[in-house]
Swiss-Prot record:
Protein family per UniProt: Belongs to the isocitrate and isopropylmalate dehydrogenases family. LeuB type 1 subfamily.
One Pfam match: Iso_dh
Keyword tags: Amino-acid biosynthesis, Branched-chain amino acid biosynthesis, Cytoplasm, Leucine biosynthesis, Magnesium, Manganese, Metal-binding, NAD, Oxidoreductase
Pathway named in the protein's UniProt entry: Amino-acid biosynthesis; L-leucine biosynthesis; L-leucine from 3-methyl-2-oxobutanoate: step 3/4
Keyword hit for Metal-binding: yes
Residues that, per the record, bind NAD(+): G289, S290, A291, P292, D293, I294, A295, G296, Q297, G298, I299, A300, N301
Gene Ontology terms, MF aspect: 3-isopropylmalate dehydrogenase activity; magnesium ion binding; NAD binding
Broadest EC class assigned to this enzyme: oxidoreductase
Main location: cytoplasm
Name of the molecule in the record: 3-isopropylmalate dehydrogenase 1
Length: 370
């Protein structure tokens, strides 16, 4: 890596600040012990900033985000947001960041952790080979399209409206991400839609198929209706390699698939836009939310954030060997019995604090790197 590899840490709300802090310690280990020339910065975001400035995100933070190669983000959310206009949350929160960075692809790897078998609701034989990548379209669909809003009719009734809309270029753009990933993995893509009742779903199916036929004939493509996909994720999750879905379906299915990991605290994610001069700038975050009920207690699971750092090492900083090392260290820490409260499954062993869990990963890194 060059000297210009800039990692920006943004804790955000609730437990986000705690888990990102620990992931930052891991990043510092790679800089100090592995010689990775990382420039690590921090920026404020969320309720802390809101209380000081009346805004969720300042212009300075947005400028730092634009300048970073990779952003490791914690969480946004909490009761304070309930009193804010929805438009302010859209314009100053994650949707603004996604728009500013041109993020359109959200990747969520889902795998089975043998050390957490007791937490997984599936029998091991059904999930032990699960290693899937969920590719979610992030910039379009029902979360963004217009018209939208809550209106009142002439007879006094209230009506809520949202619009599901995709064009061919948006669909092919995200399809290429899935097909490229499949080429480097098992060579299989399963595309999710609701083409039997939605015109947007029919276009999705047609364009994904056309993209595959024209550009990726070597990749196996299957189409599946979203309701059947939800069922198959419960019955045969190991059948999926790369799962491609639109914004809404991808949002829902990725959380459902996360049950394989045993805890939302184990799930990382990455979001990308177009490559910039051969570099893939990324926005990385654990899937779990801000968890205000446990914020400030030092008991949150930092592994989702730490595994998100591994994704940054792999995809933005192009250090796959270092990413593999970090993922093996997480696996080793878990195999050695390291558990935060969400990973105990009723066991008698004491729960580790957020910091102690990160310490267990650091110890595993030292052992594996020796």
């Amino acid at each position: 890596m060059s000297e210009q590899n800039r990692l920006l840490l943004i804790g955000g709300d609730g437990v986000g600040a705690e888990v990102v802090h620990e992931a930052g310690r891991i990043a510092q280990w790679f800089a100090a012990r592995r010689g990775l020339p990382l420039s690590i910065g921090q920026a404020a975001f969320g309720v802390e900033v809101l209380n000081r400035t009346g805004r969720i995100m300042t212009d300075d933070t947005l400028a730092q985000i634009r300048a970073a190669d990779a952003v490791l983000f914690g969480a946004i959310g909490g009761p304070e947001y309930d009193r804010l206009p929805l438009e302010q949350v859209r314009e100053e929160g994650l949707l603004r960041i996604r728009r500013e960075l041109g993020l359109y692809a959200n990747l969520r790897p889902v795998r089975y952790w043998p050390a957490l078998a007791e937490l997984c609701p599936f029998v091991p034989e059904r999930v032990e080979k699960v290693d899937m990548m969920i590719v979610r379209e992030l910039a379009g669909g029902i979360y963004y399209a217009s018209p939208r809003g809550i209106d009142q009719t002439g007879d006094g009734r209230r009506v809520g409206t949202n619009t599901q809309r995709y064009d061919d270029l948006e669909i092919r753009r995200i399809a290429r991400v899935a097909f490229e990933l499949a080429r480097a993995r098992g060579g299989r893509v399963c595309s999710v839609d609701k083409s039997n009742v939605l015109e947007s779903g029919l276009l999705w199916r047609e364009e994904v198929q056309a993209c595959r036929d024209a550009e990726y004939p070597d990749v196996e493509l299957e189409h599946i209706l979203v309701d059947n996909c939800a069922l198959q994720l419960c019955l045969r999750p190991a059948r999926f390699d790369v799962l491609l879905a639109d914004n809404l379906f991808g949002d829902i299915l990725s959380d459902a698939a996360g049950a394989v990991a045993g805890s939302l605290g184990m799930l990382p994610s990455a979001s990308f836009g177009a490559e910039d001069g051969g570099r893939r700038r990324g926005f990385y975050e654990p899937v779990h939310g801000s968890a205000p009920d446990i914020a400030g207690q030092g008991i949150a699971n930092p592994l989702g954030a730490i595994l998100s750092l591994a994704l940054a090492l792999r995809w933005t900083f192009r250090q796959p060997a270092e990413a593999d090392l970090l993922e093996r260290a997480v696996e080793r820490a878990l195999a050695g019995g390291a558990r935060t409260l969400d990973l105990l499954a009723g066991a008698a062993a004491p729960a580790l604090s957020t910091r102690a869990m990160a310490d267990a990963v650091l110890q595993a890194l030292e052992t594996l790197a020796a």
